[in-house]
Amino acid sequence: DGFTLFDNTGGSKGSGGSGSGGIGVNSFLWRASLDTIAFMPLLSADPFGGVIITDWYGPPESQNERFKLNVFILGKTLRSDGVRATVFKQVKDTDGSWVDAARDGELDRDVEDSILTRARELKINSLPQR
């Protein structure tokens, strides 16, 4: 029958409501991560290890910078410390070569916050309606 990547039970079958749904990490955080970075090209996505790696993406409005993301889902529970994002940025120098820009921890936190907000929405939407 294959395996279940996402179930619609909200993780209620013996998983303590963790939303793990047949994968190695919290399925709400996993789905939210994919939703949040859907505009970026994926290089690798491992639902069992909880690792998502994107390729470089250049925003259409800025031809002189590009970004790459690594997202790590750190467990099976939906918690604020359950996701880590690392944003890498490169800019073009005067001869047109890409060079690494200084890291900005605020960008990392912004991506993490977006993922957490989406994960909460997914969890709320999965709860039975009263």
Show which residues each predicted segment covers.
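Ser/Thr-rich, low-complexity intrinsically disordered terminal regions
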Residues: 1-130
